[in-house]
Amino acid sequence: MFGGAHELSIDSKGRLAVPAKFRDILSRLYTPAVVVTLESKHKLLMYPVAEWEKVAAQLLNLKVADNPVLRRFQNLLLHNAEILEWDSAGRVLVSAGLRKRVDFDREVVLVGRANRLELWGREQWEAEMVQALDDDPDELAFQLSQTDLQL
């Protein structure tokens, strides 16, 4: 399971140094490669290949014929998926194609989220954290009461 947030920089060649903590999990539990794809203009998703295969199968099974929003989302994730392997320095090369689609460039936060990693622009990540911390606790408690989640 991935967890934690790491402030990093993408270098001028598009390389991102993956923290040793994440590389270790990938090496021990998966393969030393990730599939990176575009989720929105604010973040990229990075999955171990085995986890991505599960997600891709679910995406392909979506009923999208009469739902253009879901079809576009399905296409966004599947069409932009790329396999990345790290080099001897523990870096992955984020393609120019993916980098031009997101609204961040160099300063990023790589976040562990259970079965995947998320790559956010630092400003977008900070804004997301501020919003989460500013959410009304009573509204959150109500929303959580409507789920099966037990913390």
Curated annotation (Swiss-Prot):
UniProt protein name: Transcriptional regulator MraZ
Subunit structure: Forms oligomers.
GO cellular component terms, A-Z: cytoplasm; nucleoid
An example Gene Ontology molecular-function term: DNA-binding transcription factor activity
GO biological process, one term: negative regulation of DNA-templated transcription initiation
Domain of life: Bacteria
Keywords: Cytoplasm, DNA-binding, Repeat, Transcription, Transcription regulation
Stretches assigned to the SpoVT-AbrB domain: 5-51, 81-124
Pfam families per the UniProt record, alphabetical: MraZ (PF02381)
Record's subcellular location: Cytoplasm, Nucleoid
UniProt organism field: Neisseria meningitidis serogroup B (strain ATCC BAA-335 / MC58)
NCBIfam families: division/cell wall cluster transcriptional repressor MraZ
Keyword DNA repair (UniProt): no
InterPro entries (alphabetical): MraZ, MraZ_C, MraZ_dom, MraZ_N, MraZ_sf, SpoVT-AbrB_dom, SpoVT-AbrB_sf
Record family assignment: Belongs to the MraZ family.
